[in-house]
Amino acid sequence: MTITLGQSTKNDKDLFDTMDDWLRRDRFLFVGWSGLLLFPCAYFALGGWFTGTTFVTSWYTHGLASSYLEGCNFLTAAVSTPANSLAHSLLLLWGPEAQGDFTRWCKLGGLWTFVALHGAFGLIGFMLRQFELARSVQLRPYNAIAFSAPIAVFVSVFFIYPLGQSGWFFAPSFGVAAIFRFILFFQGFHNWTLNPFHMMGVSGVLGAALLCAIHGATVENTLFEDGDGANTFRAFNPTQSEETYSMVTANRFWSQIFGVAFSNKRWLHFFMLFVPVTGLWMSALGVVGLALNLRAYDFVSQEIRASEDPEFETFYTKNILLNEGIRAWMAAQDQPHENLIFPEEVLPRGNAL
């Protein structure tokens, strides 16, 4: 009986192993399995947006000009939402609405659903890319977790909110001025600025900006001197073994300024991660609430007193009047199919207007 020891010369790699080797190969631009989702979706989302803002009108959906071809500029061009009558249709090119006609598909607002869906999956692909790379180089996945916050905001605003309303029509169009108009709509119809979830979101974003400014300035203030390193490209050497700045000095400085300071870098940087991510998550949760038409804070006692006493007015009651004005003007403009007509006598009046 003979036993042969050794490796088989037969190549046992299957198709999956071959693809895995190619996708995760060390190259200038990492592809990875996540790239199969990220790159095509990002390409189609950006391509659809550039196509729409360059050529496609919103006349048939909003009664507006929205492309460079019609005279818009970068701030006023947009890929606008489908008409309200199309409700929540996916508006597939081969669907019953467009029936394979590309021109009709563009007129109906098909580019919006195209850009929104590919954009959402592109963002998810980018988050998965961070997970994949972190796993490959044995890092923890906090970058991907942090990026989940803007994804949550995007999905809640562009998908969850219009799904709770009557159609995609009530989502934001993809354009600068269009987003501004959507913000005004949110304020007028939902009193968004007085929503506690919006307040948490603003606190998170502005708090994160403050933390970044303080952290960057503190690091610059407490850099260790390293000879000529600050004046040469040695200052950018990514493999230095020593610390870049003095945490002890920074701690003493802020202890004297505020009376309290971060005692270690782990807690400091976790806090810088926690503040903006939690703020954005809370904003996304608030938008989900708006999809269900949940109300913001209402100070009804002030409204009742203001209606009875012409000399009593607060910033809150002034804002309520402004919201009523926004609703009165926007409803008639945004929903012409409803034939909404507001006589002069029912339009809001007050010091705010």
Swiss-Prot record:
A GO molecular function held by the record: iron ion binding
Post-translational modification Phosphothreonine, affected residues: T2
Chain positions recorded as pheophytin a binding sites: Q130, N143
Membrane topology, record value: Multi-pass membrane protein
Gene3D superfamilies in alphabetical order: Photosystem II protein D1-like
Example GO biological process: photosynthetic electron transport in photosystem II
Keyword annotations: Acetylation, Chlorophyll, Chromophore, Electron transport, Iron, Magnesium, Membrane, Metal-binding, Oxidoreductase, Phosphoprotein, Photosynthesis, Photosystem II, Plastid, Transmembrane, Transmembrane helix, Transport
Binding site for chlorophyll a PD2: H198
One cellular-component annotation, GO: chloroplast thylakoid membrane
Residues bearing the modification N-acetylthreonine: T2
Cofactor details (free text): The D1/D2 heterodimer binds P680, chlorophylls that are the primary electron donor of PSII, and subsequent electron acceptors. It shares a non-heme iron and each subunit binds pheophytin, quinone, additional chlorophylls, carotenoids and lipids. There is also a Cl(-1) ion associated with D1 and D2, which is required for oxygen evolution. The PSII complex binds additional chlorophylls, carotenoids and specific lipids.
Entry EC number(s): 1.10.3.9
Binding site residues for a plastoquinone: H215, F262
Glycosyltransferase listed as a keyword: no
Residues of the signal peptide: none
Transmembrane spans: 41-61, 125-141, 153-166, 208-228, 279-295
EC supergroup of this enzyme: oxidoreductase
Annotated catalysed reactions: 2 a plastoquinone + 4 hnu + 2 H2O = 2 a plastoquinol + O2
Binding site for chlorophyll a ChlzD2: H118
Any Pfam family the entry gives: Photo_RC
UniProt-annotated location(s): Plastid membrane
Function per UniProt: Photosystem II (PSII) is a light-driven water:plastoquinone oxidoreductase that uses light energy to abstract electrons from H(2)O, generating O(2) and a proton gradient subsequently used for ATP formation. It consists of a core antenna complex that captures photons, and an electron transfer chain that converts photonic excitation into a charge separation. The D1/D2 (PsbA/PsbD) reaction center heterodimer binds P680, the primary electron donor of PSII as well as several subsequent electron acceptors. D2 is needed for assembly of a stable PSII complex.
Family per record: Belongs to the reaction center PufL/M/PsbA/D family.
Subunit organization: PSII is composed of 1 copy each of membrane proteins PsbA, PsbB, PsbC, PsbD, PsbE, PsbF, PsbH, PsbI, PsbJ, PsbK, PsbL, PsbM, PsbT, PsbX, PsbY, PsbZ, Psb30/Ycf12, at least 3 peripheral proteins of the oxygen-evolving complex and a large number of cofactors. It forms dimeric complexes.
Further information: 2 of the reaction center chlorophylls (ChlD1 and ChlD2) are entirely coordinated by water.
UniProt name for this protein: Photosystem II D2 protein
Source organism per UniProt: Cuscuta gronovii
